[in-house]
């Protein structure tokens, strides 16, 4: 009865904290009778509750400490005599791990602290009172392997049981059989799960002669993960291609696909791209978390002193507003946030995207399909006959698309789009280089926003220090803070943020078109002159915006320099 009571309280807490949906709970209860599993175990198995949410809620409801098993080394403390009575199979089955003895009590780290059967069994086997602490299931399983097993990680255990035969890769049926083996399925699932735990935006799976390299892009920086051996290359790549509904027999041409799945309670949309390389197909999976994305300018890092000016340009009834920056700089998220602000019942919004990354209620979103002739330009021609107020084009890729967008702006539509340029002034010169007439640009461009993403400091643990005279002079910090002592921040590694950074924030510069800039465009002024005139009119560069954030402890000067050196 006590176990059920604890489970009930934990489930109720998960619902209250919105870490579990009512519909998912109903679904799990329907399956519970058939499976014979406990409710919380089933919720985890179905991916309806993430490991972290499960552990944090258990710790909070039961009043137990939450621990990070990754902080412990690979060598266990001196083995307790009493622990010898606990089999490795028992530890794995119940996801618990003794880590030492404290004040006559056995320090037991456990994933399911409501499991009275397992806890009583440990107490009886060891004859010791227990000190319970809660950890994530996968982290405790890894710890068990490292300490009480053969020192293998979860991936290492899977790899040992997996079969791979490079010589059979020309046989499509053999390849399909390899990809359908349970160890290969678990291996691919583990890679995706690890990406979710790391908050990665992309997974890179790259075949080489001796191994299959796995890397994750976390906060814009690639981090290498555990790599399976090269013998599993064909099986792993084929498994991903099967999940993405791609042709596993075609290995000479690039392919694009999509995987929809649920991982740790999150609905994930993975965009899959494959390209042939010397040692096999390289795969990149972009992770889109539809449930946690928030279209809020403040949460993106836009400052209160900047937003009024940006919104004023955004709310103009017609014209063109561009967002520029390299791939992965957050342009699409900024445009989606702008659209969500403009999305009211009295406005019709139509977008053309490749691909449609997030779906927004009330907005007509068109997926471009160049392979059947539905490119940006052709879609735009049809859109203007749909009586829209606002049009969003995923990217101005060519002169034809740019000219139709400009014509739409001239006929009373507000057009939002993106360009790949390094700074805001570069947006004007890029359109001129495309062949757009200068008088059309001056008549339609309202503003150009350039942006980058910098890693955000884990401010609670960052090291604050007084800036040296050399730093103050080199970065001209007195221009931003004329008075008082100037402080900067350094990242400090923690279990939650191994690099000292946690998430990313935006740094921006916003060029607002005015009469002086229009005259400069008409006389074909260079990018440098256009930027000088924009700064004279009040534009703050991305570099300056980044320095301001560094002074506030949001990021570091090193991060700002890393992303703005070409701006």
Curated annotation (Swiss-Prot):
It is an enzyme of class 7 (translocase). GO terms for biological process: protein secretion by the type II secretion system. SUPFAM superfamilies: EspE N-terminal domain-like, P-loop containing nucleoside triphosphate hydrolases. Keywords: ATP-binding, Cell inner membrane, Cell membrane, Membrane, Nucleotide-binding, Protein transport, Translocase, Transport. It comes from the Bacteria. ATP binds at residues 325-332. Its EC number is 7.4.2.8. One of its GO terms (molecular function) is identical protein binding. It is found in: Cell inner membrane. It catalyses: ATP + H2O + cellular proteinSide 1 = ADP + phosphate + cellular proteinSide 2. It holds the Pfam family T2SSE. One of its GO terms (cellular component) is plasma membrane. Belongs to the GSP E family. ATPase component of the type II secretion system required for the energy-dependent secretion of extracellular factors such as proteases and toxins from the periplasm. Acts as a molecular motor to provide the energy that is required for assembly of the pseudopilus and the extrusion of substrates generated in the cytoplasm. Forms homooligomers; most probably hexamers. Interacts with XpsL/GspL. PANTHER family: COMG OPERON PROTEIN 1, TYPE II SECRETION SYSTEM PROTEIN GSPE-RELATED. This is Type II secretion system protein E. It comes from Xanthomonas campestris pv. campestris (strain ATCC 33913 / DSM 3586 / NCPPB 528 / LMG 568 / P 25). The gene is xpsE.
């Amino acid at each position: 009865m006590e176990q059920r009571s604890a489970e009930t309280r934990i489930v109720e807490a998960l619902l209250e904290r919105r870490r579990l949906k009512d519909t998912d709970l109903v679904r799990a209860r329907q399956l519970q009778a058939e499976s014979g599993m406990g409710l919380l175990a089933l919720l985890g198995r179905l991916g309806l509750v993430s490991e972290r949410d499960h552990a944090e809620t258990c710790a909070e409801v039961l009043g137990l400490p939450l621990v990070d098993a990754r902080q412990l080394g690979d060598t266990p403390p001196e083995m307790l005599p009493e622990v010898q009575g606990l089999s490795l199979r028992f530890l794995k089955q119940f996801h618990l791990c003794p880590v030492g003895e404290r004040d006559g009590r056995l320090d037991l780290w456990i994933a399911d602290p409501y499991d009275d059967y397992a806890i009583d069994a440990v107490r009886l086997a060891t004859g010791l009172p227990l000190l319970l602490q809660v950890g994530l299931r996968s982290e405790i399983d890894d710890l068990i392997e490292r300490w009480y097993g053969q020192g293998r990680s979860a991936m290492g255990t899977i790899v040992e049981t997996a079969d791979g035969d490079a010589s059979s890769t020309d046989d499509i049926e053999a390849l399909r059989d390899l990809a359908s083996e349970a160890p290969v399925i678990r291996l691919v699932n583990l890679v995706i799960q690890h990406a979710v735990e790391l908050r990665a935006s992309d997974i890179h799976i790259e075949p080489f002669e001796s191994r299959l390299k796995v890397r994750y892009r976390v906060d814009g920086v690639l981090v290498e993960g555990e790599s399976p051996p090269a013998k599993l290359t064909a099986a792993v790549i084929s498994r991903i291609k099967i999940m993405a509904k791609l042709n596993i027999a075609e290995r000479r041409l690039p392919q694009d696909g999509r995987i929809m799945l649920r991982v740790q309670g999150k609905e994930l949309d993975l965009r899959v791209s494959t390209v042939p390389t010397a040692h096999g197909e390289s795969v990149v999976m972009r992770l889109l978390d539809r449930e946690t994305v928030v279209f809020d300018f403040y949460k993106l890092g836009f400052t209160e002193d900047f937003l009024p000016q940006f919104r004023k340009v955004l709310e103009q009834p017609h014209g063109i507003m561009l967002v520029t920056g390299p791939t992965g700089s957050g342009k699409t998220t900024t445009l989606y946030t702008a659209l969500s602000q403009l999305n009211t019942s009295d406005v019709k919004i139509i977008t053309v995207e490749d691909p449609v990354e997030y779906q927004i209620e009330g907005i007509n979103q068109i997926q471009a399909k160049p392979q059947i002739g539905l490119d940006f330009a052709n879609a735009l021609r049809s859109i203007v006959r749909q009586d829209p107020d606002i049009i969003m084009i995923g990217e101005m890729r060519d002169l034809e698309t740019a000219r139709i967008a400009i014509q739409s702006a001239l006929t009373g539509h507000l057009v939002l789009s993106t360009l790949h340029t390094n700074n805001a002034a570069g947006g004007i010169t890029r359109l001129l280089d495309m062949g757009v007439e200068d008088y059309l640009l001056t008549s339609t461009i309202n503003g150009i926003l350039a942006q980058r993403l910098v890693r955000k400091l884990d401010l609670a643990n960052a090291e604050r220090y007084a800036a040296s005279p050399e730093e103050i002079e080199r970065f001209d910090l007195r221009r931003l803070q004329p008075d008082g002592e100037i402080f900067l921040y350094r990242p400090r590694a923690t279990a939650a943020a191994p690099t000292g950074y946690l998430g990313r924030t935006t740094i921006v510069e916003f060029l607002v078109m005015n009469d002086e800039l229009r005259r400069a465009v008409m006389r074909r002024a260079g990018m440098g002159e256009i930027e000088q005139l924009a700064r004279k009119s009040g534009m703050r560069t991305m570099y300056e915006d980044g320095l301001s954030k560094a002074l506030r402890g949001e990021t570091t000067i090193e991060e700002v320099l890393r992303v703005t050196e070409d701006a």
